[in-house]
Amino acid sequence: MRFRRYFSSTFKRLIDCNSCGVKLQNKQPGALGYYTKKDDNLVKKITLEDVKYLIFGQDIQRIKEMTVDTENYDIKLEKPLICKRCSEALHNNKYNATEFKDIPFEEVEKQIPLHSNVVHTAPILEFPFHINSQLLKNRTFNTTMVFTKADRVFKNKKQVQKQIPIFLDAFFETYLNSKATRNIVTSTLNRWNLDTLFSFLHGTNYFVGEPNSGKSTLINALLRRLFGVKIRGNDVKNFELDKQAEEELAVSKKFFLEKQLAGVSHIPNLTRTLQAYKIKQKIIYDLPGYSNYNSYRIDEFIDPKWLQRFRKTSIFSEKRVKKKRYDSIVGNENGKCLTLGGIFYLVPPPTTINQIVCYIPGELRQFHNTDRGIEVLGKSGSKEHPLNKYCGIKPGIGKEKYIRHIIPPFQGPIEVVLKDIGYFSLTPTGKYEYKGLYELWVLDGIDVCIRKPLERVAEDSYDKSQEGKYYIKEPVVSHTYVVAHNDPNPLQTVKESYEKVKERTDEILNKYNLEKFGNNMWHFKW
């Protein structure tokens, strides 16, 4: 009869939470790193053979003739331990946002030695948000810019490998007067450019980015693809697998690898300490995500289930990118609007016909005006509410929680980016004619900008680069303009606001001979 053999690191080595990296303890339930200690007095499952042995134990010959069921005695490998906070967040989507404290960039930067090799990660779908100009301009670091989640923007590998990097090089030179060592665009889901990224890594690398920028997922993809290990202990250079880890590897390579992976969650600030990994002969440090929230956290307003949809790339359908199915909305004098879950309300000018392709999970809904939409969705939350499936906000959210954004005048299609949420494309149909300004009412705490469609600028930059070096010839990104809820003349307010930022915009336009075209109030500043 064969009994289970248990492999556990609980008492054989000092361990951290396999998800967030803090030291585990089982004495103080309310303190940091608490986990529920497993009872070691395990009772083996009683099988029919056990019962037979108890009844006929003295009949040895009869026992030998019986068929022994060893199915319940297979080797069992324990999963890596995680703290209670991470367990509730990862498995039950239950968490207190105050426990996931924001970490300023300055604190993260202190953990990076001077002259280190830095991999700065940012999701390409929310470009140009999440790009840290301070980090890119820091000459004491050798920085590689790595964009993640490319499958949520681009249809194929060619766009990612050959087209968009040309535009990115020109963009950084134009808008930031700075260059990363290189720009690499990746997708862990489709495994785009993972080998390219690894080939550019140095002996020691520090992965830096904002929460949910995809750095931990990127590290996990490299660990799986190239079979790396998580370094436990402080002696990084001389790290070797101990006997227990070697036994685990011998029993199950797949299970062993799962224990090496970085903690990944749609919840920001899950990682709290620096964690090290070794892939072949290269060392990777995963640093906590940094953020500086000066306003409300979106967790206070948006339903946790909707936030999970927005942030989890694995549940995003690529059909949205490839098929580009659109919703239409015709503007009118009453302020007809279109919303996604009450998170934003788009109000087009009267008589304009517009096509919206939303790359954010959720269903769109139209209302008579923003007041009506905010009133209806603000009362949802109960299962009986007829529009509950369209509501992504918590009950009781009123108009005072929204910021009124004005989109600067534009020609042709644009993409509207909502930081930490996603983006949607907006295309007015027919011949261009100015009929008014587009408004966007967005929950406070969500940054908004607009950009030229990334697929289009990627293809355009690639085509023009075949004739020589590519230069950006028109503004490609812009902030929106914030106006008061009751502002009767937003166009005048936009003009006055533009005069305040015009000097910086004109400096860029004149330096690189950019042409304004119809985007004559576009501006962007980090």
From Swiss-Prot:
SUPFAM superfamilies: P-loop containing nucleoside triphosphate hydrolases (SSF52540). Transmembrane segments: none annotated. One of its GO terms (biological process) is maturation of SSU-rRNA. One of its GO terms (molecular function) is GTP binding. Signal peptide: none annotated. Residues 1-14 form a transit peptide. Keywords: Mitochondrion, Transit peptide. The keyword Transit peptide applies. InterPro entries: G_CP_dom (IPR030378), GTP-bd (IPR006073), Mito_lipid_metab_GTPase (IPR050896), P-loop_NTPase (IPR027417). GO terms for cellular component: mitochondrial inner membrane. It is found in: Mitochondrion. Residues 105-293 form the CP-type G domain. May be involved in the mitochondrial lipid metabolism. PANTHER family: GENETIC INTERACTOR OF PROHIBITINS 3, MITOCHONDRIAL. Belongs to the TRAFAC class YlqF/YawG GTPase family. GEP3 subfamily. This is Genetic interactor of prohibitins 3, mitochondrial. It comes from Candida glabrata (strain ATCC 2001 / BCRC 20586 / JCM 3761 / NBRC 0622 / NRRL Y-65 / CBS 138) (Yeast). The lineage of its organism: Eukaryota, Fungi, Dikarya, Ascomycota, Saccharomycotina.
